[in-house]
Amino acid sequence: MMKKNNSAKRGPQDGNQQPAPPEKVGWVRKFCGKGIFREIWKNRYVVLKGDQLYISEKEVKDEKNIQEVFDLSDYEKCEELRKSKSRSKKNHSKFTLAHSKQPGNTAPNLIFLAVSPEEKESWINALNSAITRAKNRILDEVTVEEDSYLAHPTRDRAKIQHSRRPPTRGHLMAVASTSTSDGMLTLDLIQEEDPSPEEPTSCAESFRVDLDKSVAQLAGSRRRADSDRIQPSADRASSLSRPWEKTDKGATYTPQAPKKLTPTEKGRCASLEEILSQRDAASARTLQLRAEEPPTPALPNPGQLSRIQDLVARKLEETQELLAEVQGLGDGKRKAKDPPRSPPDSESEQLLLETERLLGEASSNWSQAKRVLQEVRELRDLYRQMDLQTPDSHLRQTTPHSQYRKSLM
């Protein structure tokens, strides 16, 4: 509930209370208008008390008898008044009291002239402070009872220490599954801030006990899986007796936890039997691929090849004879001519030269065909030898392996 405070109102005070002293009093010159030749300035006694400004022609002790009274709530500010082009001493001591530009405000602007610039600054500061108090007078008159105070919703609330909530079991299992170590798994996920002697410690201890149990179970299952994976290869390797690995009978043996093997190390630990079986499987696979291969094209029979060779040889001889005749004919004609250095311009000579060139090309082609047929004959003989040697070599290769395996078993 809001009510007005009557102590700030103007009016006669109670008999028991003494009147407050004025903030500032003194003589200043007030601007009273302009005459014919100069400005009119008159000495006035000014009293500043509260939010009222009293102006009198003579010094008066009781403010009630002063006729000029101005309410400072109608004014906006007090500031220095100086003309830029004036060199007079009065220019440094003038100050004005400007009224506020509110509608209906009839307070006049007041212009004063202090005794000195220091006195001017003192009056400006005092009047500005009084104007500020006058504008805040309405707010100062309002008081609020203690019973009507608004209750703050969180001011008196108890402060609680908020710690991080513990991780869920699903999160713990996910972290444990991605862990690479078989030892202890430590998760510092609980932030202990001033724990109470009973509840927080017990909660943290129970959480850590559950975590240790889950980690121990996970590590045990991993060790069992690794031992089951490594045991068959270890049994096969132990079946082969190695004399250099025999230990003394009196020596004690301390069992150790099996070591995890990488994929590359697992490939290196294969037994001898597995290597031999893989080799036999590879050889059987090669034989199967050979059987599935398409048959090689049949080579010509020896009779056909010999007939082709005879034909090529006969054609080569005929071509060489014709070439020799043409060369002899051309040499005879060249010797019979008188001018030995004349170029062969006649058509017969050109025809002879062209015939000689063609016969030379034919002779070279027949020679190349003869060489090709000879190579074909050699390849046929080589294939025959390979076909005869393949079964015997296969039997020779398989027999030592089987005997060696029998000796190892």
Curated annotation (Swiss-Prot):
Keyword tags: Cell membrane, Cytoplasm, Membrane, Nucleus, Phosphoprotein, Tumor suppressor
Induction: Up-regulated by IFNG/IFN-gamma and IL2/interleukin-2 or in C2C12 cells.
Pfam families per record: PH
Boundaries of every PH domain copy: 21-132
Feature: compositional bias, Basic and acidic residues: 331-340
Region feature Interaction with capping proteins (CPs), mapped onto this chain: 133-193
Positions of post-translational Phosphoserine modification: 227, 271, 342
PTM summary: C-terminal fragments could be released during apoptosis via caspase-3-dependent cleavage.
Localization of this protein: Cell membrane; Nucleus; Cytoplasm
InterPro entries given in the database record: PH-like_dom_sf, PH_domain, PKHO1/2
GO biological process: lamellipodium morphogenesis; myoblast fusion; myoblast migration; regulation of cell shape; regulation of myoblast fusion
Tissue: Abundantly expressed in skeletal muscle and heart, moderately in kidney, liver, brain and placenta and sparingly in the pancreas and lung. Easily detectable in cell lines such as MOLT-4, HEK293 and Jurkat.
Predominant place of localization: membrane
Segments of this protein annotated with the region Negative regulator of AP-1 activity: 308-409
Name this protein carries in UniProt: Pleckstrin homology domain-containing family O member 1
Lineage: Eukaryota, Metazoa, Chordata, Craniata, Vertebrata
